[in-house]
Amino acid sequence: MGGQVRVAIVGAGGRMGRTLIESAYHQEHIRLGAAIERPGSSLVGVDAGELVGVGKLNVIIMDSLDYATDDFDVLIDFTAPEASIVHLDWCVRHKKAMVIGTTGFNHAQKEQINAFAEQTPVVMAPNMSVGVNLMWKLLELAAEVMGDYTDIEIIEGHHRYKKDAPSGTALKMGEVIAKTLGRDLEKCAVYGREGITGERDRETIGFATVRAGDLVGEHTAMFADIGERLEITHKASSRMTFANGAMRAAHWLVEQKPGLYDMQQVLGLN
């Protein structure tokens, strides 16, 4: 799309919401059309630009999408699973596209998203960063070459406030590796180890989780053999990388037909 894409951001007052507002401000092809907070928030009525320190944008934080129906083309949501489902339902009814960066969806919620995406364009990805999406491609190659004879472990770390574990990015890493190797992640995943576990089963994929301080996001996949190991690591030092990826997804999504897309498609990696 040649012109500016208007975006709305829900959860505007949160850590990620504020970063998204700042990212939208700096994007040439994006314009912030609306910013939404929960009813009762002390931020309702505040100018979104002044909230994040970029100056007045004349976009006042509101407490309902219903007040912003004509102000945006794509909704960007990094909130919580239950809220994201409600917002997607709203987007379907009002013919709006949606970018979902929320993680922690259960199986039933994912099925709801699949059904809604038949009626409106949706990009959903556990991680919007370019580097992470490239990492998933590298994991495919590593799994093809080394996966059958190495022990595979995935280690991830995030800030103390993150609510779901393992992270959506770590689970996607496991899914990519398992699919490449013809395994079912639900059957081969091992989440943490404690006590007398016995010898390691080569077919398993292990997960370890760290929650500490202000870690933005660190992910490592280890392919370990006797005598050598390969580690593929991505470290995020700022949430801005995720926000910029979400803006890129929004700009791409506005011209797509209804369907469920991911960042691999946005970036042309598929």
UniProtKB/Swiss-Prot annotation:
InterPro entries: DapB_C (IPR022663), DapB_N (IPR000846), DapB_N_CS (IPR022664), DHDPR_bac (IPR023940), NAD(P)-bd_dom_sf (IPR036291). It is found in: Cytoplasm. GO terms for biological process: diaminopimelate biosynthetic process; lysine biosynthetic process via diaminopimelate. One of its GO terms (cellular component) is cytosol. It catalyses: (S)-2,3,4,5-tetrahydrodipicolinate + NAD(+) + H2O = (2S,4S)-4-hydroxy-2,3,4,5-tetrahydrodipicolinate + NADH + H(+); (S)-2,3,4,5-tetrahydrodipicolinate + NADP(+) + H2O = (2S,4S)-4-hydroxy-2,3,4,5-tetrahydrodipicolinate + NADPH + H(+). PROSITE patterns: DAPB (PS01298). Keywords: Amino-acid biosynthesis, Cytoplasm, Diaminopimelate biosynthesis, Lysine biosynthesis, NAD, NADP, Oxidoreductase. Its main location: cytoplasm. The keyword Protein biosynthesis does not apply. Belongs to the DapB family. Catalyzes the conversion of 4-hydroxy-tetrahydrodipicolinate (HTPA) to tetrahydrodipicolinate. This is 4-hydroxy-tetrahydrodipicolinate reductase. The gene is dapB.
